Amino acid sequence: MYSKVKSLGISGMEAFAVTVECDISSGLPRFDVVGLPDTVVKESRERVRSTIKNCKLEFPLSRITVNIAPADIKKEGALYDLPVLIAILKSSGQIKENVDDYAFIGELALDGEIRSARGILPMIMSAKEQGLNKVFVPEENAYEGSVVDGVEVYPASHIKDVLLHIKNEKPIKAVKYNFDEEVKYEYNIDFSDVKGQDQAKRALEIAAAGGHNCLLIGPPGSGKSMLAKRLPTILPDMTFEEKLETSKVYSIAGKIPKGKSLVSKRPFRSPHHTVSAQALTGGGANPKPGEISLAHNGVMFMDEFPEFDRRAKESLRQPLEDGVVTVSRTAGTFTYPSSIMLVAAMNPCPCGYFGHPSKPCTCSDAAKKRYKDKVSGPLLDRIDIHVEVSPVEYDELSNNSESEKSRDIKKRVDKAREIQRKRFEGTDITCNAKMTPKITKECCVLSEEADNLLHESFDSFAMSARAYDKILRLARTIADLAESKEIKLEHIAEALQFRTLDRKYWDE
């Protein structure tokens, strides 16, 4: 007897419709799974067989063929256990009710318990697009899936619960997402914790206001990491669309905590400098998002930047420029979102004390050159703001007066972002850092004095076209913070000062 059951699958960042077909025919007992399954999917035969036996159901002693379509897409993971079991029960006549209105997702334990699966959110979003409005998911993932309006998400903890619902003996109540329960995330760190470092704080305020990448250069203990960790506290609150995008990435990576639905705060990722290029960009045998994508709509902090593997550093080029990372593997080509703010931190030399007012540098010129050469020119070009973080003076540390709080800086950032939102209304651009060269030219109107200064600087600093555009975007953000429609002399001057450190450290 033939039956088919609906399910869903994940390939890269996208979900797709899956049909699990089952045919039970006469012949020697045999259980085959076809349809380009991976090893885990093939192993579902034993999980399904044991579950049927342990739940006092009848396993057909016939020839069983299960096809997981479409056959041209590789199926990965154990999430097909539940639909395979339902298809077998349907084919063997143990389920007589119509299940065409339902889709089934979930891994089975041998006792019939339904375990969590990754990628539930994008799969439910895909179900809605395909007109599927009833989906059984593991209980642990139900709240995550309930975010999608228009789809009834049924939490299932055991196969018996699913069967009782199908037979209408004990209906399961669909989970409803309560938007009123969303709470604003409160940070337990604040910019006021950082003593001194006014220039670095100003640089991070500009970075937050325009979505710019930033490089912090300074000796050990100057507060680079402390500053970077506080950057999310002044970033604008995430919109619902941003929460959905970010949660989709985290869902596919299997990083949404049990009982949670949306990622409500801006991600902050801080990979160790020994991380591989693949761990940064994503991919692998079973492709998953990497650190860059896990920082989507948030901040990725790379401390000890020169110490990262060169391939790992250079793999940042495309994501920083395009906002996406494309990974090509044998299984196919996958594109992951990576709209991030990069904050990189480094010492000025291997010992860390080049230019220090009191501690002498012990590095040779050759050692300093080798250290700085670990960061390539094209990568530096993609970082908008270069700021020197000087050692904190005793007077600043001992000063008991309270520094400006994150909430006050955030108000200015929010105001600048609102100006940008209105400016880019009707486009895909979200902030000044994402402006195309054409839009940069249209939106960056310079006063005569500002234009003259930029012209002189372009010639004397031998700027690239990319660096020129980045200075304009940076000046546009500074002008937005000052609520000025025109980019004035002081805005260009401040933007230029954040682009001169590469001359000091790399061209000396």
Language model segments and positions:
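Short beta-strand elements
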Residues: 18-24, 280, 384-387
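The Walker A (P-loop) glycine that initiates the GxxxxGKT/S ATP-binding motif of P-loop NTPases
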Residues: 218, 282, 304
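Residues immediately C-terminal
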Residues: 110, 300-301, 307-308
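Walker A/P-loop
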Residues: 216-257
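Conserved alpha-helical scaffold flanking the Walker A/P-loop in AAA+ ATPase domains
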Residues: 205, 261-262, 266-267, 277-300, ...
